[in-house]
Structures are given as structure tokens and as C-alpha cells.
UniProtKB/Swiss-Prot annotation:
A Pfam family that the UniProt record links to this protein: LIAS_N
Catalytic activity of the protein: [[Fe-S] cluster scaffold protein carrying a second [4Fe-4S](2+) cluster] + N(6)-octanoyl-L-lysyl-[protein] + 2 oxidized [2Fe-2S]-[ferredoxin] + 2 S-adenosyl-L-methionine + 4 H(+) = [[Fe-S] cluster scaffold protein] + N(6)-[(R)-dihydrolipoyl]-L-lysyl-[protein] + 4 Fe(3+) + 2 hydrogen sulfide + 2 5'-deoxyadenosine + 2 L-methionine + 2 reduced [2Fe-2S]-[ferredoxin]
Taxonomy of the source species: Eukaryota, Metazoa, Spiralia, Lophotrochozoa, Platyhelminthes
Name of the protein in question: Lipoyl synthase, mitochondrial
HAMAP family in the cross-refs: Lipoyl_synth
Residues reported in the UniProt entry to bind [4Fe-4S] cluster 2: 165, 169, 172
Length: 410
């Protein structure tokens, strides 16, 4: 398929300031060529990240994250003011002169969700032993998405494979453990049953990472998608999935289940990957996962095994200390990987144990990034302080895109 490639390599120093080379790269023009893969054949992001000199973490901190941080490590981190790790998680730019965290700006304050649709959905979810990423990740849009309006239905986002993740990303409040409980074999059916009872026409199925499973949970996700389609064929399914550690077979398994949208988040710019995400995640690995999903979908359509080309989607958080040039590069990299839709939102610290906010981005700047995304050729760019990867404003637009693709059979 035709994708966009930059005239340059994908190498940045980790945790370093933006170099002159990086600035030049953001301004390079892009050429269109036909490719199969736009990245190296190796699936490990460590090769990309270690070939060049980087700012090394302290030995103590490297040891602490060797197997991914646990909840207890986060607690110790927040209570140890003398540790070098504490300095790593905060900086003078993330606090005011009094030493307190940045004050939440007015544009990020939302009403506390309660009663009505929120209470009803919570009760139904608990009765079926299901979990939502809205609750686990403390999303600020839970009330808006779960409450139906005059002209819109509530949008549901279900988190499957349990509520405990094997990874410990330092922005996420989902529980972590190297040995989470086994998968519930009845979950795909229970999930489909719950969704069939809701007045929704767009459902997001997301999950925790399950590195303890051979396929990363891909077959479980695929089974869930198929069960939903059996019970409610008209519904549009978006799957927001892990990177499966770069395993192409797992990606293919999910794509073959025919979700309309295949989403995977790169989360942040390249230089902050090791700061923000678990060490098993990686910038190139995430980009390659998205590209692989689109390529597989393209082959299924070409062979007549699928009726439409999957929409691919990713998300970026701002306010973690990223540079503007780096955000521009990340958006260009997503486009060249064939990503159709992107969401850009403000990072908000979920608890004191997690990464502090370096900057609250003004809404005008999010408008700027929305224009940049549209100029780069994304089918849809949702950009705003409260926008999250499953924000419903984008979902209705994506639904329109999918309907068009199905009608045209492309």
C-alpha cells in the first residue's frame, strides 16, 4: 500500500532535549512510495533505542523497573523524597514555587458522574463481572459518554481480560501484577450479552496487557468481537488492543475477527517512551503493530475474506514534557504507518504515585494540533484537553467513515 516515508532515520536520544537533527527532521518533506513495511524486520524496539548514545538512568532506577514497576514500587517512589527516582518523576517545571503540583485549570474541571445512566450501567457491569476502562483509568468523560443525550445514545467502553495489567506504565492507574488471575472463559459471551442489552451502536472493546499469555490474549479478544457480532450484527466494534509484544500472529488473529476499528495507542512522543510507558512497550513496536493491522486488513479485502478495510486509530497525551517538534514527528510517523484517525488529549495525573503533569496545554493549542492533523491527511483528528482515545465525539465521525467504506466495499 502507498505510505509516507521521511528522508531520514528514526533515532532520538532518550530523555534528551530536542536536537538540531530532530528539528530538521520535523521539517523534512515526505515522499509517497509503495512499501510493505516501513520499519526494520526486527520486532524489538530495544535495537532502535540502544544503537545510539542515550542519557542513562541511574543503576538503582534501572534495577527497579527491570521487570516493570509494581504498585508497591509506585508507593515507595512517592514517599521517598531523597531517591534519585523521585527526581526522575518530577522536575521544577511540574511544580509551582511553593512546591505544590500545578493547579488544575478551569477547562479541565468536570461534573462528578452520578445517578441515571451511570448508575444503571455500573450495576449491570458488576452483575456480569465486567470492567470498564472508563472507571479503571479514571477517565474525565465518563459522565458524558455514559449519559445519553437528546440526539445521541450512550457510548460504552468495556475492558476485558480482567482489571489487572501485567505492565506498569507510569501514567496509568489500572492495577498491575506479573501474575494476574486467569482469563474468564465466559467473559466473551457475558460481554456480548451485556452489550446486546444497551442502546448503543458503537462499542469500544479494550483490555489490559496480558504478557503472561502466549498470544497476549488475542484469541480471547477475537472471540469477544465475534460473540458481539452474532448478537448485534449492526453494532460497530472498535478494539483498543495491546501491542502483543509485536507478535504479528496475534495482530492477525484480532483483525480476522473483523472489528471495524483497530486502535493501539503510542501514548507519547518517542523520546519519552521509557519515562511514560512500561519497558516492554516501544515507539517503533507500536507503529509497526498499527501498520501490520492495516496490511492484514488490506490482504483480507483483496482476497475477498473481508468486506471493508479496517480503520486504524491511535492516541497521544500532551503535558508530559514533550516538545512541539516531537509531537509533529509523532503525527507524521502515525500517518506514514497508515493510521487513519488520531486523538490528542491532556495527560492528567491519576494519583500521587504516577507521573506529574509538566504542563497543562491551553485549548487553543489543541485546536492547532487538530488543524495539523487534518493537514497531514488523517481522516479524523480529535484534539482537546478532555479528549481520550475512546472519546465519543470521534466515534460518530468514524461510524460515518465505516458506513461509507462498507457501501463502497473498499
Amino acid at each position: 500500500m502507498g505510505l509516507l516515508l521521511p528522508r531520514g532515520s528514526y533515532v532520538f536520544p532518550v530523555l534528551a532535549s530536542v536536537s538540531a537533527a530532530t528539528k530538521r527532521r520535523a521539517e523534512w518533506s515526505y515522499i509517497k512510495i509503495n512499501i510493505t513495511h516501513s520499519y526494520s524486520s526486527n520486532d524489538k524496539s530495544s535495537e532502535f533505542e540502544e544503537d545510539n548514545p542515550t542519557q542513562k538512568l541511574s543503576p538503582e532506577f534501572q534495577k527497579a523497573i527491570a521487570h516493570g514497576p509494581s504498585l508497591s514500587e509506585f508507593i515507595k517512589l512517592s514517599n521517598n523524597n531523597q531517591s534519585t527516582k523521585e527526581d526522575f518523576f518530577s522536575s521544577p517545571s511540574s511544580v509551582n514555587k511553593s512546591g505544590k503540583s500545578l493547579r488544575l485549570p478551569e477547562w479541565l474541571k468536570t461534573e462528578i458522574p452520578c445517578g441515571g445512566s451511570v448508575a444503571r450501567l455500573q450495576k449491570q457491569l458488576r452483575s456480569l463481572n465486567l470492567h470498564t476502562v472508563c472507571e479503571e483509568a479514571r477517565c474525565p468523560n465518563i459522565s458524558e459518554c455514559w449519559t445519553a443525550g437528546k440526539s445521541t445514545a450512550a457510548t460504552a467502553t468495556i475492558m476485558i481480560m480482567g482489571d489487572t495489567c501485567t505492565r506498569g506504565c507510569r501514567f496509568c492507574s489500572v492495577k498491575t501484577s506479573p501474575n494476574p488471575p486467569p482469563l474468564d472463559p465466559d467473559e466473551p459471551v457475558n460481554t456480548a450479552e451485556a452489550i446486546s442489552k444497551w442502546d448503543v451502536d458503537y462499542i469500544v472493546i479494550t483490555s489490559v496487557d496480558r504478557d503472561d499469555l502466549g498470544d497476549g490474549g488475542a484469541r480471547h479478544i477475537a472471540k469477544t468481537i465475534r460473540q458481539i457480532k452474532v448478537r448485534k450484527p449492526s453494532i460497530i466494534v472498535e478494539c483498543l488492543v495491546p501491542d502483543f509484544r509485536g507478535c504479528t500472529d496475534s495482530i492477525h488473529t484480532v483483525v480476522r475477527a473483523s472489528p471495524e476499528v483497530y486502535a493501539h495507542n503510542i501514548e507519547t512522543v518517542e523520546s519519552l517512551q521509557r519515562v511514560v510507558r512500561d519497558h516492554r512497550a516501544g515507539y517503533i513496536q507500536s507503529l509497526r503493530s498499527l501498520e501490520t493491522a492495516k496490511e492484514r486488513s488490506n490482504r483480507l479485502v483483496s482476497s475477498g475474506d473481508a468486506d471493508f478495510l479496517v480503520v486504524t486509530k491511535s492516541s497521544i497525551m500532551l503535558g508530559l514534557g514533550e516538545k512541539e517538534k516531537e509531537v509533529m514527528i509523532a503525527l507524521k510517523d502515525l500517518r506514514q504507518a497508515g493510521v487513519d484517525c488520531v486523538t490528542i488529549g491532556q495527560y492528567v495525573q491519576p494519583t500521587k504515585r504516577h507521573l506529574k503533569v509538566k504542563e497543562y496545554i491551553h485549548p487553543d493549542k489543541f485546536d492547532y494540533w487538530a488543524k495539523i492533523g487534518n493537514d497531514l491527511g488523517f481522516l479524523y483528528t480529535a484534539s482537546g484537553p478532555l479528549v481520550r482515545s475512546s472519546y465519543r465525539a470521534g466515534e460518530y465521525y468514524i461510524k460515518h467513515i465505516i458506513d461509507q467504506r462498507k457501501r463502497k466495499n473498499i
